[in-house]
Amino acid sequence: MIELDRLSKRFGPVTALDDLSFTVRPGHVTGFLGPNGAGKTTTMKIILGLDAPSAGTALVNGRRYDRLVRPLHQVGSLLDATALHGGRTARLHLTSIARSNGIGRRRVGEVLRLTGMEAVADRRVNGYSLGMKQRLGLAVALLGDPPVLMLDEPVNGLDTEGIGWIRQFFKALAAEGRTVLVSSHLMSEMALTADHLIVIGRGKLLADMPTAQLIAANARHDVLLRSPRAAELAGLLTARGATVTPQPDGALVVTGLDAAAIGDLAATRGIALHALVPRQASLEDAYLDLTGESVDYHGTR
């Protein structure tokens, strides 16, 4: 379990984290989301003892990281997949870390197999793709068989097969009762991977809830329809309390009534429908609605 209590971090006049509190519980894949500069990496570094908070506490299994006994056996992390000695092989890299942490050589072979790196384990790291380096970083995180895993953008550089594999792998780790915290900018992948989400913006907590609940609470749902009597139907729908937005191509976008109610109303008036499409909001829609005011830099067209 990871517990943050009123965590704050200031860099001179800049407040990177502002009274941030949340708990990451075992048995779940928890997505950690926020715009660039929101404070995600700073939060992870403080949890791992790589930076000190200005105020508040960050605990792993009830203790600060610097007070954990055999920390690699308590929490595994991947913050930067490129932070590797390019002249070493994956096997040598893992063996060196294992030896310094009292971990046997057998475990090195196990994590190489778990992460699909066994066939390239004796190649030098400087010949690896980013996706291969991500797998090696994950192997390091797993060396101590820890109950807590923290991973910063772990799918960067992975191909489609690799992303699907890591999604199922994280779910399997959570099903074993581990605490899994994953940050990512890929909303479509987070929607498939994480069953709980923590969202921060400008160092403050914006949301802490199950994925489906966050989508339902922060995104709009609508129905797209087409009809040769669109103007007439729009008037009927508005009279029923719906909001109707005509589109340039003649379609109507309706909120406030579901597809079944719209279809029933059209049928009672003998109005033909050429299309009636319920549109489910995505995690990306919900995320953009939630974090819109926390983005520091907006593009223009």
Segments predicted by a language model, with ranges:
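Short alpha-helix boundary/capping motifs
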Residues: N101-R105, I163, S227, G256, ...
